[in-house]
Amino acid sequence: MKEAVFESSAPAASSGEASWRRYAVAVSSVLLGIIFLVSGGWKVLDPFKIGEVLEQAKVPAGFGPIGASVLGTLEVFTAFLLFTPKYRKLGGLLGSALMIFFIGWVAYFYNDLVGKDCGCFPIIKRAVGPGFFVSDGVMLLFGLIAAAWGPPLRRLRAPALALLVLAILAGGNFAFGAVQRRNVEMPYPVAVEGKPTDLRTGKVFLFFYDPMCSHCDAASKYLSTLSWKDARIIAIPTNDPQFAKDFLRDTKLKADTSLDVAKLRGKFPFVNPPYGVALVDGKVQESFGQAQFDAPSPKADLVKLGFVQ
């Protein structure tokens, strides 16, 4: 009789364990999927803005927007896999790989990134520090649970097709954004030294800066050492305009000042200064994010554009 009881309880225990695992996989997959959907969607929809944030997180200058688009596509794809029960194992594997990559990147550049906003999510500010690794460790745990206990993957055709569609959509959005940014034209008129000015002719270099920013200070000092040709430099303080003259005097940058920051920043959006825009006859030739103001950059690009010797 006891043997019969033991035999009947074994399948019940096994069934209970399987049910518990399915529940753990479902909860972990949904939570991690939401995180990746929000984070990835943000990157895909605005790769140029997020690209600046990535470059500030030590991604090589110029590769931020592409990196944002690629990472965003992979994150949204991972979310799709995690939301689809039969693909949760693959979603867990890819999600875990992404989390390990993020944790490893921040750990490697920790001394440079500590205290800065990681730029992981829209609206939510999350500073790099010990807490960053704790929260990302929890996300990694979610991915490992889905990878370990998710149902076996049988076919890859549907996931491959989904990835292809997402890549096409992300690529199209990236191309549209690039064309849109390139086709922006200088507004008219712009107040320069307090007077309405037409900056739609000739070579113009817009230099956005914060007078209290050490990186802006270094960038301005470096720009002042370049041999400028016939380009006109317009310096635009993003904060504390009362210090504009002192800033230019201290950094020895020969530039005219414009306080039309709202008008110009509306046309040429960016995250944090320093930021530069090279224009010829009012049309954008190239823009320079914060990460591109580390000497000897952006001299080479300005030479190619004919702005400096």
Please give the residue ranges for each predicted region:
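Non-catalytic, surface beta->alpha helical segment in thiol-disulfide oxidoreductase systems
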Residues: 269-309
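Membrane-embedded alpha-helical segments of integral membrane proteins
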Residues: 100-149
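Short, Lys/Arg-rich, polar N-terminal cytosolic tail immediately upstream
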Residues: 1-23
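Short active-site neighborhood of thiol/selenol oxidoreductases, capturing the structured segment around
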Residues: 196-217, 222-226, 236
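Internal/C-terminal transmembrane anchor helices
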Residues: 153-180
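Thiol-based oxidoreductase modules, predominantly thioredoxin-like and allied folds used
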Residues: 230-263
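Functionalized membrane-embedded alpha-helices
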Residues: 22-44, 64-105, 140-141
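Membrane-interface helix-boundary motifs at transmembrane edges
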Residues: 83-90, 149-159
